[in-house]
């Protein structure tokens, strides 16, 4: 984290990232605990939605978040937008709760039992391989490579799920198997207009290509080392805890904005019988999405909730990116407050 030349800097209690800055073991503990919290939310909220789900009302008009996603994956015996076999959703929810406990225990184990700094482990040990310094591009890209490979495997799992089990097709109102369309021309052309994609086969083709791309990229980052000018290309002299955090926040903000507009306008990936009608973009104090369907007062579709929440979370993540990017570049925000204090205390004298 940025210290502005002060070797004995202290951080406030709310600066949570500072606790893992130079302690790679604590960093892993925080990751595991965070994943456990997300798992717990998903499981608990799915059970909450199941308890209030009414099959006589369109799913998109019931302010649901988790159930439409599960239905879109073909879980719950969905037919014409109605869940007919909620047992499958219950199983998924309970599994998430169980795994959340496992991940939470892993976070506590890494935090309380194992070394806070993986660098304290013997040379050549598996734990030592994942120790890192924030300004070491070799070790950071080694870890990045593993992340990319697991993301690629996740894409493969999704593609195979659609091919073998099937996903929900709103055009037919049933769950059907979907084979991927690995048309590179289609994938290239959808780089700019992916919001308009209207074929599940094309969606799966994009994920299949992305899986290949991610795994190749992961292997590349694991295998390559610093060499000549490539050292600077990997970020030598640019990397720090603050800068890596800013890059991550920028990526999350981008994903949130894409999800917001995709959910608001696309009915292939976000079917109307699961999420409600498409939205309209309005501008007042700030941009926001509004429902186009006739709904009771103060009622909103699942599409409206998802799109607006993603949009505003993306906005605040973007502000966090700018904040940490400027700090990583050396800008001291305390100077802003000092400048205002100097303006208030300045005396104007007649010439």
Swiss-Prot record:
Top-rank lineage group of the source organism: Bacteria
GO biological process, one term: photosynthetic electron transport chain
Pfam families membership: PSII (PF00421)
Up-regulation conditions: This transcript is expressed at a very low level between 4.5 and 72 umol blue light/m2/s. The whole antenna complex is most highly expressed under low light; as the light levels increase antenna complex levels decrease. Thus at least in this strain the amount of antenna complex is controlled mostly at a post-transcriptional level. The transcript is also strongly induced in response to iron-starvation.
Keyword Transmembrane helix belongs to the record: yes
Entry's localization field: Cellular thylakoid membrane
Entry-linked InterPro entries: PS_antenna-like, PS_II_antenna-like_sf
Principal location listed in the UniProt entry: membrane
TM region(s), chain numbering: 27-47, 64-84, 89-109, 203-223, 244-264, 306-326
One term of GO molecular function: chlorophyll binding
Membrane topology note: Multi-pass membrane protein
UniProt KW Transmembrane keyword: yes
Cofactor(s) the record lists: divinyl chlorophyll a; divinyl chlorophyll b
GO cellular component: photosystem I; photosystem II; plasma membrane-derived thylakoid membrane
Keywords: Chlorophyll, Chromophore, Membrane, Photosynthesis, Photosystem I, Photosystem II, Thylakoid, Transmembrane, Transmembrane helix
Additional detail: This low-light-adapted strain contains 8 pcb genes.
Family according to the record: Belongs to the PsbB/PsbC family. IsiA/Pcb subfamily.
Role of this protein: The antenna complex functions as a light receptor, it captures and delivers excitation energy to photosystems II and I. The Prochlorales pcb genes are not related to higher plant LHCs.
Subunit structure: The antenna complex consists of divinyl chlorophylls (a and b) and divinyl chlorophyll a/b binding proteins and binds more divinyl chlorophyll b than does the antenna complex from high-light-adapted Prochlorococcus.
The protein's name: Divinyl chlorophyll a/b light-harvesting protein PcbC
């Amino acid at each position: 984290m940025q210290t502005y030349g002060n070797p004995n800097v202290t951080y406030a209690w709310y600066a949570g990232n500072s606790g893992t800055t130079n302690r790679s073991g604590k960093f892993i503990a925080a990751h595991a605990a965070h994943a456990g919290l997300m798992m717990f939310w998903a499981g608990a909220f799915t059970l909450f939605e199941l308890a209030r789900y009414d099959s006589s009302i369109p799913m998109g008009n019931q302010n649901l978040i988790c159930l439409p996603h599960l239905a879109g994956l073909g879980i719950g015996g969905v037919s014409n937008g109605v869940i007919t076999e909620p047992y499958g959703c219950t199983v998924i929810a309970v599994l998430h709760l169980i795994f959340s406990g496992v991940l939470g225990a892993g976070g506590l184990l890494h935090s309380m039992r194992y070394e806070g700094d993986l660098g304290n482990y013997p040379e050549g040990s598996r734990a030592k391989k994942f120790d890192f310094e924030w300004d070491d591009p070799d070790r950071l890209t080694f870890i990045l490579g593993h992340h990319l490979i697991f993301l690629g495997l996740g894409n493969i799992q999704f593609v195979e799920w659609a091919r073998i089990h099937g996903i929900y097709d709103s055009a037919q109102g049933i769950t059907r198997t979907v084979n991927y369309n690995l048309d590179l021309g289609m994938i290239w052309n959808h780089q700019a207009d992916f919001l308009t994609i209207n074929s599940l086969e094309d969606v799966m083709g994009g994920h299949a290509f992305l899986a290949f791309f991610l795994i190749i990229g992961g292997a590349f980052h694991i295998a390559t080392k610093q060499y000549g000018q490539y050292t600077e290309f990997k970020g030598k002299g640019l990397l720090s805890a603050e800068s890596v955090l800013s890059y991550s926040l920028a990526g999350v903000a981008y994903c949130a904005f894409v999800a917001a507009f995709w959910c608001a306008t696309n009915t292939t990936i976000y079917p109307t019988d699961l999420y409600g009608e498409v939205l309209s973009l309005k501008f007042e104090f700030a941009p926001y999405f509004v429902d186009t369907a006739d709904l009771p007062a103060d009622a909103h579709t699942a599409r409206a909730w998802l799109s607006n929440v993603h949009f505003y979370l993306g906005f605040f993540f973007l502000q966090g990116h700018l904040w940490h990017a400027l700090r990583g570049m050396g800008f001291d925000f305390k100077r802003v407050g000092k400048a205002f204090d100097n303006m208030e205390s300045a005396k104007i004298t007649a010439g």
